[in-house]
Amino acid sequence: MVTVVENTDPKIKPVPAVIKELEEKYAGKFVVQHTVDDIPTVWVARADLLDVLLFLRKLPKPYVMLFDLSAIDERLRQHRQGLPDSDFTVFYHLMSLERNSDVRIKVALSEEDLNVPSATQIWPNANWYEREVWDMFGIVFTGHPHLTRILLPKYWEGHPLRKEYHARATEFTPYFLNTAKQQYEQENLRFVPEEWGMKRSGRDEDFMFLNIGPNHPSAHGAFRLVLQLDGEEVVDCIPDIGYHHRGAEKMAERQTWHSFIPYTDRIDYLGGVMNELPYIMSVEKLAGITIPPRAETIRVMMSEFFRITNNLLFVGTFIQDAGGMTPVFYMFTDRQKAYDVIEAVTGYRMHPAWFRIGGTAHDLPRGWQRLVREFLDWMPKRLDEYVKAALQNSVLKGRTQGVAQYNTKQALAWGVTGAGLRATGLDFDLRKARPYMGYENYDFEVPVGYNGDAYDRCMVKVEEMRQSLRIIRQCMDNMPQGPYKADHPLAVPPPKDRTLNDIETLINHFISVSWGPVMPAGECTTIVEATKGLNSYYITSDKATMSYRTRIRTPTFAHLQQMPSVINGSLVSDAIMYLASIDIVMADCDR
């Protein structure tokens, strides 16, 4: 076996158990790559790929979840010393909850032969991920049941995440829309059942095809759902995504490490600084930055505030989709109280872009404790009222209990995380399982449900808010003293008070805030327990002022893909409650 060292570490670390297991089975057939994030990473030959993936899926403590699957265009990458020759790389990020560990499998491909076998027979959620890779890179997955575009229209030309594809609007011919082009684009939106393997009629009846969206209040965003109906029963359904796609991963390749922060806020546009956290942490790991305890605590406190604002909106719209109009207005009032605190601390409400590489944009303002304490005194009583007045309502329970139900095994197979997974009885919360940002120092519980239905998913979200309130109170009571930003040359922006010392400090400050810092070459993934599930940023640095490749893994993408397996055979009304219960934001799905 050849071992590749990409990022040297002075400390000798034990060989991960999964590497030993692979060595016993495939000695000499794979290459180990060391990464900053310490996730075991191995390169395998394309011919061995499915065998290796199946082996990992069937280990005694198996890697049951395909957490992520994507690709990297390696053709312009300069700093990849020792790695196997590759024009394009397809990677598989696998997760084992029993081991509480991950493994990353990579396959090298040449530009002349962009083919790799499909993994849909091993993990059903590979379907959408492989379609996305084809859409963005043009890599073909042989054996895929329906390899078509997923984020872009089917008439789109080119594959945007290839390096030769332009990244700026000024590099394209100016866009225009005349009547003929509009009609062409509209015609391409026509749903043709045969293209999806659907029949227009059954043995004794004709099916009806119903479009919900892309502009529909129950779609929770620009999203189209096509239902194949036999009366009120859903025979099959096709979630049609991509209407909110903005090319966030492509944008990351043309923004400095610092200037990409505002874009992260707009992935899950309800998550605020929670979106910034995995990106910032990945960059900090690459740079070797250790942030001060005060910055850690501030980050945790503000992240939990956004968890509360997200969950309040979720619960309100959940009840609204079931027919209860009143609670959502009360919950908007409560969200306003939370946003008053957020705005006082960060200067903005929903998209503060406030975390910085190395810490936060500034320190907490004077009087922040009073604002936080007032919110903590207000919110618990309100949650009690919502549970008593709305969530224990017999009509709501009748609409949601036993509806859109799935078990833990199904959730893991489809890559479901967050409240959707915990509602099946599995108490997996990354803040407990793999503490980050000092979460191991906080006293809080992991709410779980046991029925895996729409009602349990909602109640888990309610209990999450109670735990967030506990965490925020501990942050307030135990806020450390000290700096709010690391004293590190790659922290951005550098301290302003040092810029006037001499010409060198002034030049360094100018370069940092204009061109941006140069981050060390390497790869790093950071996963956080975000508002809707597990969110990760996998960053590849080529020792430049901008990211070479930024992969954004979002929970909504995985959760929507599961929909047909849950809803087929149910009623149209159940499909609406399923969408209401999985907490989707289409910007989070489409990126």
Curated annotation (Swiss-Prot):
Superkingdom assignment: Bacteria
Protein name stated in the entry: NADH-quinone oxidoreductase subunit C/D
Cellular compartments annotated: Cell inner membrane
InterPro entries: NADH_DH_suC (IPR010218), NADH_DH_suCD (IPR023062), NADH_Q_OxRdtase_suD (IPR001135), NADH_quin_OxRdtase_su_C/D-like (IPR037232), NADH_UbQ_OxRdtase_30kDa_su (IPR001268), NADH_UbQ_OxRdtase_49kDa_CS (IPR014029), NDH1_su_D/H (IPR022885), NiFe-Hase_large (IPR029014)
Location of the region described as NADH dehydrogenase I subunit C in the Swiss-Prot/TrEMBL record: 1-182
PANTHER family: NADH-QUINONE OXIDOREDUCTASE SUBUNIT C_D, NADH-UBIQUINONE OXIDOREDUCTASE 49 KDA SUBUNIT
NADH dehydrogenase I subunit D: annotated span: 206-591
Nucleus listed as a keyword: no
Chain segments annotated as coiled-coil in the UniProt record: none
Family: In the N-terminal section; belongs to the complex I 30 kDa subunit family.
EC number from the UniProt entry: 7.1.1.-
Encoding gene (name): nuoC
Keywords: Cell inner membrane, Cell membrane, Membrane, Multifunctional enzyme, NAD, Quinone, Translocase, Transport, Ubiquinone
Subunit structure: NDH-1 is composed of 13 different subunits. Subunits NuoB, CD, E, F, and G constitute the peripheral sector of the complex.
Gene Ontology MF term list: NAD binding; NADH dehydrogenase (ubiquinone) activity; NADH:ubiquinone reductase (non-electrogenic) activity; quinone binding
This protein's GO CC annotations: NADH dehydrogenase complex; plasma membrane
Functional note: NDH-1 shuttles electrons from NADH, via FMN and iron-sulfur (Fe-S) centers, to quinones in the respiratory chain. The immediate electron acceptor for the enzyme in this species is believed to be ubiquinone. Couples the redox reaction to proton translocation (for every two electrons transferred, four hydrogen ions are translocated across the cytoplasmic membrane), and thus conserves the redox energy in a proton gradient.
